Amino acid sequence: MTTATETKTMPRLKERYRNEIVGQLREQYQYGNPMQVPGLVKIVVNMGVGEAARDAKLIDGAVRDLATITGQKPQVRRATKSIAQFKLREGMPIGAKVTLRGDRMWEFLDRLLSIALPRIRDFRGLDGRKLDGNGNYTFGLTEQSVFHEIDQDKIDRQRGMDITVVTTATTDDEGRALLKFLGFPFKEN
């Protein structure tokens, strides 16, 4: 019987964060304690499918796309209350979301920054002013085809998604600095 020793490799971006970025942030903000340095908590990828209220099969495509992009099974989000104007009933599926933590989060962020964002047509950078006041950043993508995991021929319809990066930063300035060091391509105002 042989014992296979599996060596887990640390994600590239996580290694860069620990070895370089923490030191740069400590130097820039004069943190006394290394635990004060802001870091990433989780990334939430949300895909709203409002048309699923009329055609329930549309949610399956969104779930399949999110699972392919993130490598994790999405949670189907259902309507919490009925709204007659939208022909929406309580309990109908209206979206899907995935919460990424740990190594999956770092690997997704690496793929997003190095492969997906550069593939966007006419991309001039992300808006650096859209932080929420606590150092968390949310932005939207208009189509799922920028991710190379999605097969262009199997796309049934174009779907956008919201991506929220939750950090431990206490201010927008700290959060922006962390994201800039991680490689987020912010527009120069």
Curated annotation (Swiss-Prot):
Cross-referenced InterPro entries: Ribosomal_uL5, Ribosomal_uL5_bac-type, Ribosomal_uL5_C, Ribosomal_uL5_dom_sf, Ribosomal_uL5_N
Keyword tRNA-binding: yes
One Gene Ontology term from the biological process aspect of the record: translation
Keyword annotations: Ribonucleoprotein, Ribosomal protein, RNA-binding, rRNA-binding, tRNA-binding
Signal peptide per UniProt: none
Gene Ontology cellular component annotations, sorted alphabetically: ribonucleoprotein complex; ribosome
GO molecular function, one term: structural constituent of ribosome
tRNA-binding in keyword set: yes
Assembly notes: Part of the 50S ribosomal subunit; part of the 5S rRNA/L5/L18/L25 subcomplex. Contacts the 5S rRNA and the P site tRNA. Forms a bridge to the 30S subunit in the 70S ribosome.
Similarity field: Belongs to the universal ribosomal protein uL5 family.
Protein name (record): Large ribosomal subunit protein uL5
